[in-house]
Amino acid sequence: MAKATAKNSAKQPKYIFITGGVVSSLGKGITSASLALLLKSRGYKVFMQKLDPYLNVDPGTMSPYQHGEVFVTDDGYETDLDLGHYERFAGVQCSKASSYTSGRIYSSVLSKERAGHYLGGTVQVIPHITNEIKDAFRSAAESGADIILCEIGGVAGDIESLPFLEAARQFRFEVGVENTCFIHLTLVPYLKAAGELKTKPSQHSVAELRNIGIFPDILVCRTEMHIPQEHLDKLALFCNVKPECVIEEKDVKDSVYAVPRELSKQELDLRVLEQLHLSVHPIVHSEWDSLVKKATQPKYECTIALVGKYIAIRDAYKSVHEALQHAGMANNAKVNVECIEAEELEKNPKLIKKADGILIPGGFGSRGVNGKCAAIRYARENKVPLLGICLGMQCCVIEFARDVLGWKDANSTEFDENTTHPVIDLMDEQKNVTEKGGTMRLGAYPCKLAKDSNAAKLYKSEKISERHRHRYEFNYNSEFRKELEKAGLKIAGTSPDGKLVEMVELKNHPYFEACQFHPEFKSRPTDPHPLFTGLVKAALEQKKANGKKPTAPSEKTKKTKTK
């Protein structure tokens, strides 16, 4: 055992397991990402994993209404939106090794069984599934990280999460207590009728973990209001956690990017380093504090209309919302995002007229396409700044072909296979694809920008790399392309071989940029994406040009928003 410990201390990375209790959607992703940022700020290299209990191999085929956004990594893996938080907060590069689901784990085990890997043995949850999960934990060590944070989805007590929790329990035993830290995120609700906070749900949640052999080292308590010390002491006593390791995580009012600062005040990172027997290096202050100040005390204000198909759930466009906030910080502005259902816009075009800028995000299927095209036409004709993303770019091409060139039946073959002007068509390599999951054009691809394009000015480069998630592209038919360009639609970016059109723009327009890729996936608070900063800057200028002073929101507005 002593030899194993010595070996671990030399080469073994440290693991932090983050679990959740009482209710779902507590913010494990934000908490995990914030902790990763704090540890990184103290000089440690971090890597992050998300383990989801659902049986889909990945979330790529799931409805946005059920799952929210599908976040795409550079290496082309479709993942949970929490990986977006990891990349935005901690600045880590997530990969396929960052995302595991029960479906992926079971699929791997069953494939091995079919190949005879288990030599006729009876395949069971323990040890085969749990061993596969532990292999997933170990795969993260290839990143070379000092500390690996593993967020386990679901709620303690759910049957779906049990294999992951059991694997984590075994893993601690195998690598040593000094190399692991268990953090349990729980809810301390406030009952208005009783006028008090309740700790009992958290006690029961920890009891669920203890029943399966997991004893949390740190308890992080989500709450609407300050938790009195006597309540924290009570939780420490009944949950068998050191008093200094019961951490309050109160709701932040203005910006989610204030969470790392609040957790730092509670010394969460120090408690973790103590548990992992790691040195407490001086924290390296970055521009994070100034970013939070810009987010909470903006000088200017503008409104961006987001014309989408899935606006009923904000998480469906999570990275888009965040990228707009990053762009707002870069422009010292508060960005009010007005979500407009594309189908409603078809019935009531006036919905968009108060916007200083327009954003058309991605999506699939024909529903709402006419509404998106109506928004694009309004932006084009009235010189309103516009950014189109993925389907948004395709709609920009369709609208231009219909309303400028007069090709009234111009369309995508996704929506109309019989159109005589298929300006958007299925990519050649997609035409023989029959399965849905994981078969799109996914991940980072290089793009060459036209030297004289506005896009090149925004990026300050003619060579870029962006993440994709689509099957359809601008039709490479030379006649279509020639006519569209002749009419004024500039091809601003293509694949390096020039065959795939990745960006289009209008020259005689204050800001009209459309891209086939998803720039929102690469935007960071510390490195906002140029296409979004350009949109917000143009929107502020548009507001000023229209005689509306782009000043900061009034105190009354701020209070209303806070509620």
Swiss-Prot record:
Q: Disordered: where is this region?
A: 542-563
Q: How is its activity regulated?
A: Allosterically activated by GTP, when glutamine is the substrate; GTP has no effect on the reaction when ammonia is the substrate. The allosteric effector GTP functions by stabilizing the protein conformation that binds the tetrahedral intermediate(s) formed during glutamine hydrolysis. Inhibited by the product CTP, via allosteric rather than competitive inhibition.
What pathway does the UniProt record associate with this protein? Pyrimidine metabolism; CTP biosynthesis via de novo pathway; CTP from UDP: step 2/2
CDD domains on file = CTPS_N, GATase1_CTP_Synthase
Domain named Glutamine amidotransferase type-1 is located at 303-545
Q: What is its EC number?
A: 6.3.4.2
Q: Which NCBIfam families does the record match to this protein? A: PRK05380.1, PyrG
* Positions of the UniProt region annotated as Amidoligase domain: 1-278
Cellular component GO terms held in the UniProt record: cytosol
What is the gene name?
pyrG
Protein's recorded name: CTP synthase
Assembly and partners are described as:
Homotetramer.
> Where does the chain bind ATP?
25-30, 82, 250-252
PROSITE patterns given for it?
Answer: GATASE_TYPE_1
Q: Which family does it belong to?
A: Belongs to the CTP synthase family.
